């Protein structure tokens, strides 16, 4: 899990050197997008696979795919090969994300999972901090290719440990004939879901950046995505027995609330993570590495909130209060970020980040816990895959939205400023443009840029506030499984009866 989390951030500081070597400035966006497209599109599919095949061997195959694609990316002779390697890497990452949380479900008792998930949350925070530092170190002192090669020895050790020590009983369906498993894989749904998700993400990546939103390519992609995803939903309803996302899962109150909370938390969070460093670089004149250091208060407080939240959850049992408190703190922290001025001091931007980070640490693991506590064990892999899908989708949608809002606001606010070339802003050169302006004009442009970024933070505030609704809608279940109450994990009979009834109907 650490390798996959690290892989998302380690490349950031290496990209300039990669573009210099491959002369591929126009391909920069695809180094991240190719990974995101396959990882997001296949997340729900892996949730289904883990319910049918051996958890241990599916995870091992996923790591092997991740390792092979890392080797391909590291040895890439050109930009195209690197993009292909990143796309295959996303396939392995999708399997690893789902596999690790499924292993936790099988190995760790429910009442101890909050602490484990808190540790994983801390791991994600640490990877966000050290990833760019490691990537910069490899790029400066060895070669950017070691950003990928580092996965090989570490992943090899992980595979060996899993092979020898991980003991997970096979699913009942693991012994079924391969032909029967393939029938259960929801081929019609997969054929609709994967291209539908890819079309949606491509439209969001291209819209307003590569092409205007009115461009025929973007409109066609959005239309096709809508048709395919509606078709996928219809298949899930009409063929529930083999559905990738059975309707009974989405009808469960806590799962629906958790999905909403996950989506909205990540929509707002990725706005902060992506645009806060831009504020430091453009408004405060920080370098790329300095802006990373200045976001440490957010990352460290998130790690602290995640660990303390997991410990507290284990003691009190109930996770809903943590979700409510956490999302409320996020709202306050995000709201304060929208008050940034050009001369905002360190005390404020550090304090605002700490407030937001603590809330994020308390809240962002709760949807996964709610899913595990609310679903029968056989449905947990699918439920967790849904949460991961919502995470990736939220990140994609709102980073794209934020980029468009920033570009539009900059054009609107700087169009009348003398000496400002609007074409440089729309091509992504606003920060360097500010530094080249005369002092008098620069002050005006700086205020305009700050106002534009505040608008972006306001965009992130909307889903952050909406996440409180998802947190409040969660059922009050305890991970301690109080005596006399049957937990969702022990409700296998109920689910089997539902499956039996569904089979008879079909």
Curated annotation (Swiss-Prot):
Glycans are attached at residues 78, 141. This is MFS-type transporter nsrN. GO terms for cellular component: plasma membrane. It is a multi-pass membrane protein. The chain crosses the membrane at residues 22-42, 45-65, 88-108, 118-138, 146-166, 187-207, 218-238, 260-280, 292-312, 322-342, 349-369, 380-400, 456-476. The keyword Cell cycle does not apply. GO terms for molecular function: transmembrane transporter activity. MFS-type transporter; part of the gene cluster that mediates the biosynthesis of the tetrahydroxanthone dimer neosartorin, which exhibits antibacterial activity. It comes from Aspergillus novofumigatus (strain IBT 16806). Residues 487-506 have a biased composition (Basic and acidic residues). The keyword Nucleotide-binding does not apply. Residues 481-506 are annotated as: Disordered. It holds the Pfam family MFS_1.
């Amino acid at each position: 899990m650490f390798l996959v989390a690290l892989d998302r951030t380690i490349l950031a500081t290496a990209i300039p050197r990669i573009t210099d070597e491959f002369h591929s400035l126009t391909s920069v966006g695809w180094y991240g997008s190719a990974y995101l497209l396959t990882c997001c599109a296949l997340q729900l599919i892996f949730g289904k696979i883990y319910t049918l095949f051996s958890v241990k061997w599916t995870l091992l195959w996923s790591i092997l795919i991740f390792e092979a694609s890392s080797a391909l990316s590291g040895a890439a002779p050109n930009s195209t090969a690197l993009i292909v390697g990143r796309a295959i890497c996303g396939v392995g990452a999708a399997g690893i994300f789902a596999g690790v949380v499924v292993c936790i479900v099988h190995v760790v008792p429910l009442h101890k999972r909050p602490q484990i998930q808190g540790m994983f949350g801390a791991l994600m925070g640490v990877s966000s901090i050290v990833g760019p530092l490691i990537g910069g170190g490899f790029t400066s002192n060895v070669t950017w290719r070691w950003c990928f090669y580092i996965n090989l020895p570490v992943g090899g050790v992980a595979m060996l440990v899993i092979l020898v020590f991980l003991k997970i009983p096979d699913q009942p369906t693991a012994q079924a004939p391969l032909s029967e498993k393939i029938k259960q894989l929801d081929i019609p749904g997969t054929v609709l879901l994967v291209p539908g998700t890819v079309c949606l993400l491509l439209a969001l990546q291209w819209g307003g950046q590569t092409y205007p939103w009115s461009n025929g390519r973007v409109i066609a992609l959005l239309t096709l995505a809508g048709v395919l995803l509606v078709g996928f939903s219809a298949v899930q309803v009409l063929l529930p027995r083999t559905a990738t996302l059975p309707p009974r899962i989405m009808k469960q109150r806590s799962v629906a609330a958790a999905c909403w909370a996950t989506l909205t938390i990540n929509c707002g969070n990725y706005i902060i993570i992506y645009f806060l460093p831009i504020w430091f670089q453009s408004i405060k004149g920080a370098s790329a590495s300095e802006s990373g250091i200045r976001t440490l208060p957010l990352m460290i407080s998130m790690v602290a909130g995640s660990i303390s939240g997991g410990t507290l959850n284990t003691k009190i049992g109930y996770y809903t209060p943590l979700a409510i408190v956490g999302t409320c703190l996020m709202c306050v922290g995000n709201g304060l970020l929208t008050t940034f001025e050009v001369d905002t001091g360190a005390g404020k931007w550090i304090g605002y980040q700490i407030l937001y980070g603590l809330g994020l640490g308390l809240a962002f693991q709760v949807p996964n816990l709610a899913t595990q506590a609310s679903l029968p064990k056989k449905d947990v892999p699918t439920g967790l895959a849904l949460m991961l899908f919502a995470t990736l989708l939220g990140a994609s949608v709102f980073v794209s939205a934020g980029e468009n809002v920033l570009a539009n606001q900059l054009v609107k606010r700087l169009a009348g400023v003398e000496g400002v070339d609007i074409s440089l802003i729309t091509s992504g050169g606003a920060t360097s443009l500010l530094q080249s302006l005369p002092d008098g004009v620069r002050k005006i442009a700086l205020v305009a840029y700050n106002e534009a970024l505040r608008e972006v933070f306001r965009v992130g505030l909307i889903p952050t506030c909406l996440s409180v609704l998802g947190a409040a809608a969660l059922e009050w279940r305890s991970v301690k499984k109080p005596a006399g109450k049957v937990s969702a994990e022990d409700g296998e009979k109920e689910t089997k009866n539902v499956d039996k009834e569904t089979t008879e109907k079909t």
